[in-house]
Amino acid sequence: MLTVSRLIPRGQGLAPVLRQRASTVELDWELRQKSRLSATDSAGRALGIFLPRGTRLRGGDMLVAEDGSLVRVLATPQPVLLISACPKHGSPFDLTRAAYHLGNRHVPIELQPDHLKIEPDPVLADMLRALHLIVQADNLPFEPEGGAYAAGQGGGHGPHGQHTHPHH
């Protein structure tokens, strides 16, 4: 078993050719939340992944194995609920309201400009439909937000120092 104990978030600093040549490992959200797991990469190698506790892997992250080889993490498609505003009876604000209610329930949620994604839950699906949202089951990669205390694990904000807004 090949030991992996180093993570390069989103492959930052690596040449694109290195990211493209790397073997891949496909993991769903449940597995990407674990800091210790076994997996098999696209080259058929057994991997023992041992990362610092609390580490969450994201699609596009690069793992460095003990032999120096690189493994690119892929967010594998998994069952999700796709939530969107009803074009006839709703408004884009309905998604904001849905995100608020889901956040109050501490539900892992992927935020997109025109839709939300959550893991399947029939009770939440009924609640969202009652809010006049369209809820569809699908099989897609799931990349939920890291949350307020995720130490940079969330999507879109980037590492500190690479943005220009003032801090008060």
Swiss-Prot record:
Residues 145-168 are annotated as: Disordered. One of its GO terms (cellular component) is cytoplasm. It is found in: Cytoplasm. SMART domains: UreE_N. InterPro entries: UreE, UreE_C_dom, UreE_N, UreE_N_sf. Its main location: cytoplasm. GO terms for biological process: protein folding; protein-containing complex assembly; urea metabolic process. Pfam families: UreE_C, UreE_N. It comes from the Bacteria. One of its GO terms (molecular function) is nickel cation binding. CDD domains: UreE. Belongs to the UreE family. This is Urease accessory protein UreE. The gene is ureE.
